[in-house]
Each structure stands twice: as structure tokens, then as C-alpha cells.
Amino acid sequence: MSFTTTFAVPLECESCCDSVKQALANVQGIESVDCKLVDQLISVTGTSAPSQIVKAVQNIGKDAIVRGTGQPNSAAVCILESHAPEDQAQPIKGLARIVSVSKTLALIDITLNGLPKGTYYPSIRTSGDISDAPQSLGGVYQALGSVEVNESDSASGLFSGQAFVKSETQISSLIGRGMAVSTSPDVVKPHALVGVIARSAGVWENDKTVCSCSGKTVWEERKDVQSKGLEGQL
């Protein structure tokens, strides 16, 4: 089933809109693209993973930040962090975006980066307690298959990967639960990535470009989180 996602994109003229539409023309699953030049926003309807749309826009030298997905109260997000001592400088290693497309079906867009090459196994946990994660996250609420991390990030020797997973569940049953990403399908290892699922904005619920709390633009805030490891995932 289709859903709509809005993205903030720096647009200078109608030619920029045309370039973005052309870049997205070959992304599988896109049904329509609407470009709002004055608002510096594009909205994309279809079944494509938001992370794939961001990647396609970045491939033409522009940038894109997800501003909303799905209908009100139908979207959630989970930032996945490493608590390993060696990752203290850049703890953020992944992001999961969740959008409900029906009362019983949600799509989960999982992106991982800055990791050793290999297969990783994400799962939703019964608890959202990360005080002693991953042990405090409890047992498996829902396994989410696997993510192949095999795309070279940079000269760092680390890799990234992405998966788009269907989940027969409701967003309301996921809010507040934890997520874990482990290198084992059966055991959540001590240095697994962890995070807590929280509600996120639906389409057009967050079209502002300046944060009222910090006074920073969305692009300045993006740089802040990228310095902590969240590369190309917002």
C-alpha cells in the first residue's frame, strides 16, 4: 500500500524541481512527486523506502531531510546507538523509520552505517528500558529479518546497509518499545545497537525549517547529528 513522505530539499528554481523529479524517476515504487518551491519541500507518494529517496536526491548533489511520513499518528522513528566504549565519539549507527499503511500493516525502513561488514539482525523488544541495554530491553516482541551491511561508507573501512521490512502490527503497539540490532539472529550481544521507538510527524505536520527551541535550521541540526554518526539518514 502507498504512503506519502515529505522532505525538505534546498530548491532554488523550477529547474531544481525538475532535477529532483528526474532523479526520482528511476526509483522503484514511486507513484508521484510534488515539488513546492516556495516551501523548499517535496512530497513523494508510493511504496519506496524514504532512505532510498534521500539517497537518490543526494546522488545529484542536493540533500534531503525527512519532515513527515504517513497520516497523523501513523509514523514512528527509532535512533539506533552503540554503547561500546570505542563508539563514544559517534554513537549513532542507524535509524528505523516506521509508517503505518493500514490498521494491521506497517513498513519499517532500517538504515545502518559506520559498521563492520556483515549481516545484522534487528528486532523489536518487549521493553523500552535502555538503562542496562541490551539486557534491560527484554525478550523479542518481533524479529525484523536481516540487514546486509556491505556498502562501503568511505575510506574508514566501515560499511552501510538498508532493509525495508513489512510488519503486521499497529504503530500504537510499538511506541515506547525498544529496538536492538545484533550480529546474531538468536542472541542480542552486549554491544548491540539499541534505541526506543517514538512517535514522529505525519505528512505536513512538521514543515518548519527553523527549530523554535534551538533557533537552528534543519540543515544546521542535521550537521549536529551527523557529527555523532547519523550519516545520510534523516
UniProtKB/Swiss-Prot annotation:
**Single Gene Ontology BP annotation:** removal of superoxide radicals
**This protein's UniProt keywords:** Chaperone, Copper, Cytoplasm, Disulfide bond, Metal-binding
Q: Where does Cu cation 2 bind?
A: 211, 213
Q: Where is this gene product found?
A: Cytoplasm
InterPro entries (alphabetical): HMA_dom, HMA_dom_sf, SOD-like_Cu/Zn_dom_sf
User: What's one GO MF term for it?
Assistant: copper ion binding
For whether the record's keyword set contains Secreted, the answer is no
Q: Which GO terms describe its cellular component?
A: cytoplasm; cytosol; mitochondrial inner membrane; nucleus; protein folding chaperone complex; superoxide dismutase complex
Q: Quick one: which residues bind Cu cation 1?
A: 13, 16
Among its keywords, does the record have DNA-binding?
no
What is the free-text note on the cofactor?
Binds 2 copper ions per subunit.
HMA domain residues:
2-65
Q: Which cofactor does it need?
A: Cu(2+)
Briefly state the protein's biological role.
Copper chaperone for superoxide dismutase 1 (SOD1). Binds copper ions and delivers them specifically to SOD1.
What family classification does the UniProt entry report for this protein? Answer: Belongs to the CCS1 family.
- What is this protein called in UniProt? Superoxide dismutase 1 copper chaperone
Underlying gene? CCS1
